[in-house]
C-alpha cells in the first residue's frame, strides 16, 4: 500500500500530443525542425528507424520490470489472512477445551458450545478437574511484632509532635491573653467580634461612646501574632497627622507663633500595642478636629474665614491671621508643652471638641423632640469649635479699639470719663471652658460731667442680629431716667455720638 502513489498535480495539456490540434502542432514542428526545405525523405526514414529501435528497447525494459509475480500489498494480505486463521483455530480449541471441562459439571450447558468434531470423537463429561489446595504460609510471630512496633513508633512520634505543638500554642495563648488583660486593665473597651472572617477581640478606640458622630467610629481588632503577642489593627486606616496652628502678622509675612505639640500623653505607655492604640486614637481625634473646623469654617466666610489648599485661614484684622493646617506628624514630636500663643490656641480647639462631644452625649440621653417637618433646622449642625474662640478674640480686639478711641476723646474733653467691665460668668460656667463657651459681653460706662451718663453694651461680634454697640443714655449721674436708647454697628458711629454728647455736656463759654 505504501508503494501506491497518488498525485493531485494538474495535467499539462501541452505535454499530451494526442489532444493537440493542427494549429498547435504546426508551430511546434516549425520550432523543432525549422524550415521544411531541409526535410528530405532519407532523413525522415532514418529518424523513423531510430524511433522504432528506441521503442523496442523500452518495451523490453517494461517486460523485465513487470516480471515480479506478486506485489507487496498481496503479500501483506496473505500474511494477514494466515494470522486471522491461526487466531480463529486457537480460540476454537480453547472454547472446546473449556466446554469439555465444564461438561463434567453441566453437560447441557457445555454441549451447546462444543464443536461437532469434538462431540463426535470425545464423549461429554470425559474431562474433569480437581482443586489444588494452596500451600499454607507459616505464621511468623516476628512479622506481626515488627508491624506493631513500627505502628507504635509512628504513633509515639505523632503524639510528641502534637504535644509540642499544643505546648507552643498554649504558650502563645497565654502571652496573648496576658496582653489582652493588660490592655483591659487600662480601661479600654473590648468586645467580641461577630465576624467569621475575623478572629480576635474588638476594641473601641474612637469617641462614639463620648458623643462623637464622626464617620469613623474608631473600631479595631486585637489579633494574635505568630509569636503570640497582641497586634492592634484598626478597621479603617487612620492617617498619622495632627492639627497645627500658625499665627502670622504683617499680612502673613511674619510668623509670630507655631504650635508643635502632638503627643498628649505625659507618660506614654511602654506596651507597644497600647502605645499604638493611643497613637491611633490621637490621630483620629486630630482628624475629626480638622474636619469639624473645616466644616464650621464654611459658615463663617462672612467673617473672613476661608478654606483653601488644605488649610483654614482666619483673618483677625489689623494684619493678623491664624492658619490652621492638618500636617504630618514629625519624626520626633515634641512632648513638652510650651505656653506659646499657638499652643494655647490649638489646646483650646481640642478642649472645645471634647466639650462638643459631651454636649452631644447629653443630647442623645435626653428624650427626642416631636417629629418636625422637612423644613426644620439642620439635624447635624457643625460643632461650635472655631466660633467661640473667634468670638472672644474679635470681641477683645473690639473692646481694645473702643478703649483707645475713648481715651483719645477724654484727652480733648475734660468732663469725659469711661470705665469698661466684662460680665463675669455664672457659677455654673465658672470654669475656663465655661467662660469660653459663654458669649462675650462687655459693659462700657461713660460719664459726661454731671449732666448725664451712658451705658454701652458690647455683645459678641458674631451675633449679627444685634447692634455692635447698644447705647442707653441716662440723665444726671444715676441710671434711673433714660433719655435715649440707640444702637451702632460701627465704632466710628459710636465715636461721633460720644463726641457729640461730650460737646453738649460741656459748659458754654461766655463771650
Swiss-Prot record:
One of its GO terms (cellular component) is mediator complex. It comes from the Eukaryota. It is found in: Nucleus. One of its GO terms (molecular function) is transcription coregulator activity. GO terms for biological process: regulation of transcription by RNA polymerase II. Keywords: Activator, Nucleus, Transcription, Transcription regulation. Component of the Mediator complex. Component of the Mediator complex, a coactivator involved in the regulated transcription of nearly all RNA polymerase II-dependent genes. Mediator functions as a bridge to convey information from gene-specific regulatory proteins to the basal RNA polymerase II transcription machinery. Mediator is recruited to promoters by direct interactions with regulatory proteins and serves as a scaffold for the assembly of a functional preinitiation complex with RNA polymerase II and the general transcription factors. This is Mediator of RNA polymerase II transcription subunit 17. It comes from Yarrowia lipolytica (strain CLIB 122 / E 150) (Yeast).
Amino acid at each position: 500500500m505504501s508503494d501506491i502513489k497518488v498525485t493531485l498535480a494538474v495535467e499539462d495539456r501541452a505535454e499530451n500530443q494526442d489532444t493537440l490540434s493542427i494549429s498547435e502542432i504546426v508551430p511546434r514542428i516549425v520550432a523543432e525542425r525549422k524550415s521544411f526545405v531541409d526535410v528530405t525523405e532519407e532523413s525522415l526514414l532514418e529518424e523513423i528507424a531510430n524511433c522504432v529501435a528506441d521503442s523496442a528497447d523500452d518495451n523490453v525494459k517494461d517486460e523485465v520490470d513487470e516480471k515480479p509475480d506478486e506485489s507487496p500489498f498481496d503479500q501483506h494480505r496473505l500474511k494477514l489472512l494466515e494470522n486471522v486463521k491461526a487466531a480463529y483455530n486457537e480460540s476454537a480449541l480453547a472454547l472446546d477445551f473449556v466446554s469439555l471441562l465444564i461438561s463434567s459439571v453441566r453437560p447441557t450447558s457445555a454441549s451447546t458450545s462444543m464443536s461437532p468434531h469434538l462431540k463426535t470423537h470425545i464423549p461429554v463429561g470425559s474431562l474433569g478437574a480437581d482443586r489444588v489446595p494452596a500451600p499454607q504460609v507459616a505464621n511468623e510471630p516476628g512479622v506481626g511484632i515488627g508491624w506493631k512496633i513500627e505502628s507504635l513508633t509512628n504513633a509515639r512520634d505523632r503524639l510528641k509532635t502534637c504535644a509540642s505543638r499544643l505546648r507552643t500554642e498554649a504558650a502563645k495563648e497565654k502571652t496573648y491573653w496576658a496582653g489582652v488583660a493588660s490592655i483591659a486593665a487600662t480601661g479600654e473597651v473590648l468586645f467580641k467580634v461577630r465576624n467569621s472572617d475575623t478572629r480576635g477581640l474588638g476594641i473601641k478606640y474612637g469617641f462614639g461612646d463620648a458623643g462623637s458622630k464622626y464617620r469613623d467610629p474608631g473600631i479595631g481588632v486585637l489579633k494574635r501574632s505568630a509569636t503570640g503577642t497582641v497586634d492592634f489593627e484598626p478597621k479603617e486606616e487612620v492617617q498619622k497627622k495632627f492639627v497645627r496652628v500658625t499665627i502670622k502678622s504683617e499680612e502673613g509675612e511674619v510668623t509670630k507663633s507655631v504650635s508643635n505639640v502632638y503627643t498628649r500623653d505625659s507618660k506614654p505607655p511602654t506596651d507597644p500595642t497600647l502605645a499604638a492604640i493611643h497613637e491611633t486614637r490621637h490621630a483620629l481625634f486630630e482628624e475629626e478636629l480638622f474636619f469639624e473646623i473645616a466644616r464650621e469654617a464654611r459658615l463663617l466666610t462672612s467673617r473672613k474665614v476661608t478654606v483653601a489648599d488644605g488649610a483654614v485661614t482666619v483673618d483677625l484684622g489689623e494684619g493678623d491671621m491664624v492658619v490652621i493646617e492638618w500636617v504630618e506628624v514629625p519624626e520626633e514630636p515634641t512632648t513638652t508643652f510650651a505656653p506659646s500663643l499657638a499652643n494655647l490656641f490649638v489646646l483650646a480647639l481640642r478642649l472645645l471638641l471634647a466639650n462638643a462631644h459631651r454636649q452631644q452625649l447629653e443630647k442623645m440621653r435626653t428624650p427626642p423632640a416631636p417629629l418636625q417637618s422637612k423644613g426644620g433646622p439642620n439635624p447635624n449642625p457643625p460643632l461650635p469649635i472655631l466660633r467661640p474662640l473667634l468670638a472672644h478674640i474679635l470681641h477683645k480686639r473690639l473692646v481694645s479699639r473702643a478703649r483707645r478711641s475713648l481715651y483719645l476723646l477724654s484727652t480733648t474733653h475734660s468732663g469725659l470719663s469711661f470705665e469698661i467691665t466684662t460680665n463675669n460668668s455664672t457659677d455654673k460656667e465658672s470654669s475656663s471652658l465655661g467662660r469660653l463657651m459663654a458669649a462675650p459681653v462687655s459693659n462700657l460706662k461713660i460719664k459726661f460731667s454731671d449732666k448725664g451718663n451712658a451705658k454701652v453694651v458690647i455683645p459678641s461680634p458674631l451675633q449679627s442680629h444685634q447692634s455692635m454697640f447698644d447705647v442707653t443714655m441716662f440723665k444726671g449721674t444715676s441710671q434711673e431716667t433714660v433719655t435715649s436708647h440707640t444702637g451702632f454697628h460701627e465704632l466710628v458711629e459710636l465715636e461721633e455720638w460720644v463726641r457729640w454728647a461730650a460737646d453738649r455736656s460741656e459748659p458754654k463759654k461766655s463771650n
